[in-house]
Curated annotation (Swiss-Prot):
Organism: Limosilactobacillus fermentum (strain NBRC 3956 / LMG 18251)
Region (Disordered): 64-97
Homology family: Belongs to the XseB family.
Composition skew (Polar residues), residue ranges: 77-88
Role: Bidirectionally degrades single-stranded DNA into large acid-insoluble oligonucleotides, which are then degraded further into small acid-soluble oligonucleotides.
Cellular component annotations (GO), alphabetically ordered: cytosol; exodeoxyribonuclease VII complex
Localization of this protein: Cytoplasm
SUPFAM superfamilies, sorted: XseB-like
Name of the protein in its database record: Exodeoxyribonuclease 7 small subunit
Quaternary structure and partners: Heterooligomer composed of large and small subunits.
Pfam families: Exonuc_VII_S (PF02609)
Enzyme class: hydrolase
Principal subcellular localization: cytoplasm
Annotated catalysed reactions: Exonucleolytic cleavage in either 5'- to 3'- or 3'- to 5'-direction to yield nucleoside 5'-phosphates
Length: 97
């Protein structure tokens, strides 16, 4: 079996190609089984990618469908889960130099 295409669109096109071959019915039983396995793997990978995209979009939107602004530096997200402890850089004051 060849390596799977990388992009979502390439994987989807390959899955559509497999489905078409299986629907045509002119494939041997053994080849059908292999195509089915490959198709299921692609289907699961695609479903995972869609779930990740949906989660990402849901995290960016509030309950009213409004887009959240990008996270600012110093928040818990950009610090790997560590909250900003109130540190203020001396370079932000402007009167260092």
């Amino acid at each position: 079996m060849a390596s799977q295409p990388k992009s979502f669109e390439e994987q989807l096109a390959k899955l559509q190609e497999i489905v078409t071959k299986l629907q045509q019915g002119n494939v041997s039983l053994n080849d059908s089984i292999e195509l089915f396995k490959e198709g299921m793997t692609l289907s699961n990978d695609l479903k995972g990618q869609l779930n990740e995209a949906e989660t990402t979009l849901a995290q960016m939107m509030d309950e009213n469908g409004q887009l959240h602004p990008a996270e600012e530096k110093g928040d818990d997200v950009s610090n790997n889960g560590v909250q900003n402890q109130g540190y203020k850089s001396q370079f932000l004051d402007g009167d260092v130099f």
